[in-house]
Amino acid sequence: MNKPLQMPMFKPETEWVPPTHLPDLKDHKEIAIDLETRDPNLMTMGSGSVRRDGEVIGIAVAVEGWSGYFPINHEGGGNMDRALVLDWFEEVLQTTATKIFHNAMYDVSWIRSMGFYINGGIIDTMIAASLCNENRWSYTLDSVAKEYIGVGKSEKLLVEAAKEWGINPKAEMWRLPAPLVGEYAEQDAVITLKLWAAMQHEIEKQDLWDVFNLETNLFPCLVDMKFKGVRVDIDKAEQTKKSLLVSEKQMHQDIKKIAGFDVEIWAGASIAKAFDIVKLPYDRTEKGAPSFTKNFLATHPHELPKLINQAREINKASTTFIDTILKHNHKGRIHSDINQIRSDDGGTVTGRFSYSNPNLQQIPARHKELGPLIRSLFIPEEKCKWGCFDYSQQEPRLVVHFASLLRLEGTQTIVDGYNSGDADFHQMIADMAGIERKQAKTINLGLMYGMGKNKLMAELGLLKEAAEKLIKTYHQRAPFVKMLSDAVSRRADDSGKIRTIGGRLCHFD
């Protein structure tokens, strides 16, 4: 329930007036669009565009030489005829002009929620900003615009109005009278249009058109994916939740029998107390706090740490995974936010996709029991089956490819192996180094993904001296892996950046 608005003692002055006509924009080649919304669950559930638990309250449009904000559902009044505005807006969307947004996924999803589809190309200046600098501290329109066009967003009137009305200027903007929002909202579209003009020069300067076009062409498919979502078996999820709670309760009782008290499985001090009672040694951090890593608990020969680890795994499966599925379920489907590029909402600096609300990539895979159990809650479409596809040793192939281009020692044997058939890189490295395949694979992938020495030792399950000896032997007999890593590091240090085959830049300033 919304709290009542406090009546302002002084109304902030504004010169903004709503548009007096609905212009014909079909002759314009570029149209910038920005929506203002009421999206009450945005911070906890993600965009409400699919759930439709919010609404569009106003539409800002800008073209060369003209701009306007069309309020249609401000609680504080001052709205235009909703049906008239939406009919006009649909005509705008159907023009062949390129539609320009900042954070297009948000606005385009709300446009889809309104029942409209966009004709013509879609440009996202946030994607452009991320490709130009994936390490920015902020990707807001205000931040990016200040850097590239030297103009930010003026929020003075909006902040003053929100203060007078006693509301949050961003989250509750929809509650204000439209005239107090119009200036702020309209400038979003104007700045987005100007920003795109500047970003084109930056894309050209950094030679990023190929990767920008790739991301741009991919975008409509991602919107479709978001709205399609993935089916989930809610009944099974609820039953699984109950079953896991029973198992977790039993494990807590088993732990109590050994320790003599109720152990808080996520509290280091509580676990330390239990270890002290049964006289088990444990590590401490540099600051002296008890340390109980997953690997330490899982591989410990005593029953107590094993039970604590198992209870943790079940608790995490129940709270992190199943509760998340139940929370984000919408009519039997999960509609995650897809983070195409790095942004303030998530994403990666490498261009790899990530998901949020919920994060589908966190679904466990390696646990022999919990992995299949949680994954079985996601069900394919009717008359379809899930397919599992993966590249065959993609990381090793890339390493060998680039190492062979540099003619690094030891690569020719691997190249010959790949050329002669379906070679097993990990086994070839194991044979070269005289170690087990499992150990070779752990070291291979650890080095390829920049795993630190301590983490690598933990993954190998060896004590420090034995692990260091094994890694040393690996580097002596398969030297090209470290040699390539060192060469790439030097190049990154010298130029401050590297470029992928697809043209994406990774900066190391």
List PLM regions with ranges.
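Conserved beta-strand -> loop -> alpha-helix junction used to position metal-binding or nucleic-acid-contacting
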Residues: Y117-E134, L141-K146, G421-Q427
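Conserved, non-catalytic sequence blocks in retroelement Pol enzymes and Pol-derived host proteins
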Residues: L131-E134, E183, F389, G417-S420
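Conserved "right-hand" nucleotidyltransferase catalytic core of DNA-directed polymerases
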Residues: M1-H74, N119, R136, K146-L370, ...
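Nucleic-acid-processing active sites and adjacent nucleic-acid-binding tracks
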Residues: E64-K99, V230
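Acidic beta-strand-to-loop metal/phosphate-binding motif
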Residues: A32, A97-A104, C388
